[in-house]
Amino acid sequence: NPEENEKSIMEFIQANRDIRGIAVMNSRGYIIADILRKKGINDIIIISFDLTSNNTRCIKNGSITALLCQRPELQGFNAIKEMIQHLIYKQEGKGNHYTMPIDIVMQENLPYYK
């Protein structure tokens, strides 16, 4: 419920006036960013995940400072590649541990991302 979200967020901000940053651990950072922007609060840094259209809009208007992007296309590609290697070529996979790059997207480097 958007009204309840706004009420809860503003109660939290008012109870924690010294807060300087918020880390949103999912792709919905735009919800908090939009509320703070609507209320004229622009001195809180917001970091969130994923380059969604709403988060991209907030990066562009400065209400989100940074996004951590996990390259879902590459994750999917690597999963399919491992499955093909195992099912068709009978090769052992790398196990259950894979390292993946994480991009930090900000206003300055946003144009380099789709």
PLM regions with names:
Residues 41, 61-62, 99:
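Short, well-ordered coil/turn elements that cap or connect secondary structure elements
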Residues 71-114:
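Hinge/cleft segment of the Venus flytrap/periplasmic-binding protein
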Residues 27, 54, 74-78:
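Conserved active-site and cofactor/substrate-binding residues in soluble primary-metabolism enzymes
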Residues 52-60:
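Flexible loop/hinge segments that line or gate small-molecule binding clefts
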Residues 61-73:
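Short beta-strand elements at the ligand-binding edges of bilobed clamshell
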